[in-house]
Amino acid sequence: MRLRRTLLTLALAAAVFGAAASAQTPADRVDPFIGTTNFGTANPGAVTPHGMMSVVPFNVMGSEENVYDKDARWWSTPYEYHNKFFTGFAHGALSGVGCPELGALLTMATTGPLTVDYREYGTSYRDEKASPGYYSVFLDKYGVLAEATATARSSAERYTFPEGTGHILLNLGEGLTNESGAMVRRVSATEIEGTKLLGTFCYNAQKVFPVYFVLRVSKTPSAGGYWKKQRKMTGVEAEWTPDNGRYKLYTEYGRELSGDDVGYWFSFDGLAAGEQVEVRMGISYVSTENARKNLDAEQAADAPFDAIREQARKGWNEALGRIRVEGGAEQQQRVFYTALYHALLHPNLVSDVNGEYPLMERSGETGVTDGERYTVFSLWDTCRNLHQLLTLVYPDRQREMLRSMTGMYEEWGWLPKWELYGRETFTMEGDPAIPVIVDSWMKGLRDFDVAKAYEAMRKSATTPGAQNRMRPDIDPYIEKGYIPLGFYAKDLAGDTSVSHALEYYMADAALSLLADSLGHGDDARLFRARSLGYKRYYSPESGTLRPLHPDGTFLSPFDPKAGENFTAAPGFHEGSAWNYTFYVPHDVEGLAKLMGGRRKF
């Protein structure tokens, strides 16, 4: 009898567990904290699929208690899980990149006496919670619960205060970006607008661009005003101001304020315990007018925070739900859906609700699209698998991305390599737009201007190096079939010639397929032949690809393992000869033959 009761209990438990598991949505299986440690450079912020806006906890500055500080080492993310000093929410951030950028427009809630120095107003925190489209945290110093959610182009934050005086701060002087310069203007007691300069991504000092914002608070403040960090003065000059080298509060100034380290504060006296103040922000990369339009279009004035949060969650369930996973452990499903979640962050929207967007490499000029314009084309990172996934599962979005890429060619004469908000950073190597576009075409995604795309691809594959923005080292590639050591980088420790050539081989192999599909037989044969030039790099002695000197001799001495753990490896970028030797996906059988047959391969 006891055994029967036990079996019945187990059966009921299994039924309940199965019902609970089946009731889970794809968003329930996402853990946004995955990838936020060990230099994963992900973050747990609130964002929608491919959203322009993200609201990210900023915890990488201001305290020696942090394990990682953005200014103390190479650092490229606004958040690290092991850090414990919170200095606000950043609006607009990159995920998974290797260079610091964006992560600015920092909002913060505080209580008690007003202070605007982030080293002083920052706080420890606890009780972090994150799910797709939502993030919350409890701020220890202030007893404030901070929550954030987002729409495609705007954000909503909700701060639950204890009894007393509370403040909302907007810090425009700090952020992850290495650029400085901002402007803020009071529109009304509850609304401000302005702009912040961003850019200088991956050592590209001239690749800068503005982000525009409109910010509103839900409650009329008791007071408000600007702040600015004053320059350090010496001697008699210093006697003229009590704020020498410190943050100065402007309580009687009502026009716009500009500077490298400026901000705005709202104060709320007499808050009841549990009273909430909400902050809404719209952004644009075109204008403050468009930032306001984005905010008004995506958030009704009386839209509850929880309704916006639920809308974001619904969007994620629709996007993640295009793939249904069965079987496997719960942890495996969580890993899968979190990876899919991360795959749907970039490229992201740059066009506003009215279709306007910044033209490619034409600073200050604006275009209009009747669809969506995308940005953050980190194509060296994504050309091999991300866009193939989008083509198969999200063809509607991939189609708009293809149109965005061909639009960039029409606007400045080249397809993107590593494009960031209308600026080409030329980060990494190769001609990675080609395999992305060709793969989509060959899979049947054809609702874009393929003739224009082919024109762009052929241009980068044939233009001499001196005029070639995509392949500046193409001359020896065409003449010799390979790129010799020292041609593009005189310092061999920084030479990546083999990596460059391998990217071109893959691009030309893809281009030959498209040429054949479009009936350009001569081009198809030409680019196919070029794609097989990798064989010149093969060294029977090492059994790997090996860098070549201009005279055709192999680099010697040579260690095919050099490059492990980011050590210097002449000829190779972020990898070793063993890593790169197998990077000929267009001719695997040919590589196996070079190596002595399939068994040895």
Residue ranges and their predicted role:
Residues 1-10:
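Bacterial N-terminal signal peptides that target proteins for export
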Residues 9-18:
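Bacterial N-terminal signal peptides
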Residues 19-23:
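Sec/Tat signal peptide C-region and signal peptidase I cleavage site
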Residues 24-383, 387, 391-435, 441-502, ...:
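Accessory carbohydrate-recognition regions in carbohydrate-active enzymes
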Residues 507:
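ATP-dependent phospho-/nucleotidyl transfer catalytic cores
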